[in-house]
Amino acid sequence: MTRLIRNSVILLKIDAVYGEDAAPSGAGDALLASNLSINPLNAQNQSRDVIRQFLGNSEQLVGTRYKEVGFDLELVGSGTPGTPPAWGKALRACGFAETILATTRVDYTPISTSFESACIYWYDDGVLHKLFGARGTA
C-alpha cells in the first residue's frame, strides 16, 4: 500500500537520559519539516572470509544496526524574544548549545563535548518509527 508523505509527522524531544524513550507528544514537540526521508534499517555487516574446501560465498554477520532519517527545517523564530524556536531542539541534538538571553534572544553555538541527544517519533502515514538517542548534523 502506498504511503503519502503529507500524512507524516515528526515529533522530537531532547532525551533526559541517553537512549531512553522521552515520549514526545503534541504540538510542543512537532516539527514543521520538508524533504522527508527515512531508512528504517541500516546495517553494517561483518564479512567472514573463511577458507573452505568447496566453492561458495561466506556468510555475513549483521553488525551495527541503526535508523537514518533526514529532513529540512525552516529557520524561523518563535515570535517571542527570548523564547527558543521549535527547531531549537533539533539543533541541540546536532551538537549546538542553546543560550537563552531572557526577553532578548536565543543563541546557538557549536560545542565539542557533552552532546545532547533526542528521541524522535516519525509517524509515516500510520507507521510509527521510534529513534532513541538520536544525534545529527546540521
Where are these regions (language model features)?
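Signature of extracytoplasmic/envelope-associated structural regions
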Residues: 1-138
